[in-house]
């Protein structure tokens, strides 16, 4: 009866991989740490595993695909184009009309456009060292190192402040000497913003926003210093210029104004009517240098990138094509089209669409739902409060760490510390590496446990004494198996991981023949161990020595086998051992600890072992080495069969 109880306990201990939960937790924790070092902060742990399944990344254009460093490049006023020089937020630059430098202070129409952009604004231009006294900057000559200029607020508005500063508008008057009487803030639905100021001639409203929206609200247009009626022909001309500027990748805003009587409560509703159009302003937001490469990397990994932006369709298409995100055959859809589309029609179009322009948060939600209906695993970026529903609906919601709101970050599974699209691709890459590593140590631990179970089961079936006692099995599962398994979680990314298609989300961990590998390789380890036990028992007739030989043979077979688990896609000879020094260290420590369990007198009493002699080690090395060689043979046979099967299918 005692022998039967021991057999049952030993089989139970052998069947349960005690170290597996701890190793899974360590793998996920290390993965989160690695992602954090690459600026991807994981807020919800399941996202780590889901990242490896992502098939579509829906990314905002501004700040994620581009630098979010707006610079005014062009004005269109009174039928003329005015170029603006300068880079970034430094308030130095010139104004050129037909290639000739002009002083904006002498151009009343241009100055009004600059003034509207400058004062219809909440952003602040600052330096990262002591601020200098504000003064006209048009003629300022730079001496010495250029100061670092920064924008506090929205970069689009910041670009308009910089343009005004280039023309000599005094920075110190903003927000102090000339405070607005009232503000009608920007809203994604309205696509415009208005600020009302009190000037010497009374109240004046300055308005900026999407050209198609502002033009529809204008009844007049400023031409050659006179206000003319806004005719249908003028509307078409302005919108044509808007399309031209947008097709060059510029973000275009329309600038307008109107004089107001004294305001009463309900008068605010009519402020943004009967406006006078002053002109258009085009701003450049250069793409991030690393994004083009990251988009190509994602494409090679079977991950499609979709641009979602509030900008004009032509602006979005220009940027998308410059990044290699959209080709000639790809669809681009604007928000107005989305409004008129049924869900079924959107379902048809979304598969071939790479760009969505002039979208609002409700559109984002519909796009995510349509992509998910096609079976895609969707990652969606967002920064505003209204983006939270779309982020929650996505499989991986991604918030912006620099520009995002607290509400969006709370709803997201991941936060980008640098607001960079390349970080999303890096996180997908890490997600695949983590999943690969989880499969590696599951393969290792379960094959080792299968070998232990088979050893015990065969001995019981054929009537042999128990080859292993429970304490020996626990020692292997928790110590000599556990350390190499943890080291496998630190394996670097397979260079070919991003050339494979995303795995199916419902794909089990034992897919792609992993279960068969575990079973076959567990059989090999088990046969080696039981053979070592039988040979030692037959030669010496000492049960304790035979158990020690079987115990040590099993440990050595497992320590050899761990190197076979480093890759499912490469042979052992193709993997560089030096890329995971932790594994080498773990194997060395596990081997040393096994020697202590065999030779240390105190440990011998605990683990029921005896000191082994040279002949015992010959048996151990021959059989554990044979198991390693046989694993290689089995793997080669499996690859050959797989290759021939694929050729036959073709």
Task: Identify the residue ranges that each predicted region occupies.
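Generic alpha-helical transmembrane segments
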Residues: 480, 525-526, 548-562
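Membrane-helix interface and helix-disruption motif detector
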Residues: 539-545
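Helical transmembrane-bundle signal
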Residues: 522-525, 529, 558-561, 590-594
């Amino acid at each position: 009866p005692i022998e039967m109880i021991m057999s049952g306990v030993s089989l139970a201990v052998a069947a349960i991989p005690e170290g597996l939960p701890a190793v899974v937790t360590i793998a996920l924790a290390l993965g989160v740490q690695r992602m954090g070092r690459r600026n991807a902060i994981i807020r919800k742990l399941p996202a780590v595993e889901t990242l490896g399944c992502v098939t579509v990344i829906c990314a905002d254009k501004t700040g994620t695909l581009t630098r979010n460093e707006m610079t005014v490049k062009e004005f269109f006023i009174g039928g003329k184009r005015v170029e603006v020089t300068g880079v970034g937020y430094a308030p130095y630059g010139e104004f050129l009309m037909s290639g000739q430098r002009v002083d904006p202070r002498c151009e009343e129409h241009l100055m009004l456009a600059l003034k509207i952009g400058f004062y219809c604004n909440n952003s602040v231009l600052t330096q990262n060292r002591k601020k200098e006294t504000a003064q006209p900057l048009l003629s300022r000559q730079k001496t010495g190192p250029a100061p670092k200029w920064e924008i506090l607020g929205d970069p689009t508005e910041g670009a308009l402040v910089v343009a005004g500063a280039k023309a000599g508008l005094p920075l110190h008057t903003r927000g102090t000497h000339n405070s607005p009487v009232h503000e009608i803030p920007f809203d994604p639905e309205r696509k415009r913003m208005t600020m009302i100021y009190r000037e010497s001639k009374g109240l004046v409203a300055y308005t900026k926003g999407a050209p198609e929206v502002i033009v529809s609200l204008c009844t007049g247009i400023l031409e050659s210093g006179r206000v003319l009626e806004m005719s249908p022909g003028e509307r078409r001309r302005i919108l044509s210029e808007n399309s031209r500027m947008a097709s060059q990748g510029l973000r275009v805003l329309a600038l307008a104004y109107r004089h107001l009587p004294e305001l009463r409560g309900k008068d605010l509703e009519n402020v943004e009517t009967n406006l006078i159009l002053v002109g258009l302003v085009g701003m450049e937001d250069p793409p991030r240098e690393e994004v083009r490469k990251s988009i190509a990397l994602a494409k090679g990994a079977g991950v499609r990138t979709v641009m979602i932006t509030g900008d004009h369709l032509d602006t979005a298409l220009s940027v998308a094509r410059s990044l290699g995100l959209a080709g000639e055959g790809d669809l681009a859809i604007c928000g107005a089209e989305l409004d008129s589309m049924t869900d079924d029609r959107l379902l048809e179009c979304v598969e071939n669409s790479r760009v969505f322009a002039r979208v609002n948060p409700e559109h984002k939600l519909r796009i995510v739902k349509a992509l998910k209906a096609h079976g895609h695993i969707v990652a969606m970026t967002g920064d505003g409060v209204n983006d939270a529903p779309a982020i929650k609906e996505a499989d991986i919601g991604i918030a912006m760490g620099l520009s995002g709101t607290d509400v969006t970050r709370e709803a997201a599974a991941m936060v980008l510390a640098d607001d960079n699209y390349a970080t999303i691709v890096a996180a997908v890459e890490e997600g695949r590496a983590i999943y690969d590593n989880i499969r590696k140590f599951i393969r290792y631990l379960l094959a080792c446990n299968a070998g232990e179970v088979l050893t015990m089961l065969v001995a019981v079936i054929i009537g042999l004494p128990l080859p292993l006692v429970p304490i020996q099995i626990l020692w292997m599962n928790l110590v000599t198996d556990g350390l190499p398994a943890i080291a496998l979680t630190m394996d670097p990314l397979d260079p070919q991981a991003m050339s494979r298609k995303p795995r199916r989300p419902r794909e089990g961990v034992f897919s792609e023949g992993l279960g068969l590998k575990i079973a076959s390789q567990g059989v090999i380890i088990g046969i080696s161990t039981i053979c070592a036990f039988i040979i030692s028992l037959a030669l010496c007739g000492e049960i304790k020595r035979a158990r020690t030989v079987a115990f040590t043979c099993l440990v050595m077979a497992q320590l050899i086998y761990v190197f076979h688990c480093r890759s499912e896609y490469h042979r052992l000879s193709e993997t560089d051992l030096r890329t995971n020094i932790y594994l080498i260290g773990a194997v060395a420590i596990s081997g040393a600890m096994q020697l202590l369990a065999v030779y240390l007198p105190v440990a011998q009493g605990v683990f029921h072992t005896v000191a082994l002699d040279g002949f015992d080690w010959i048996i151990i090395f021959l059989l554990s080495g044979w198991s390693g060689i046989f694993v290689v043979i089995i793997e080669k046979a499996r690859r050959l069969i797989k290759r021939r099967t694929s050729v036959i299918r073709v």
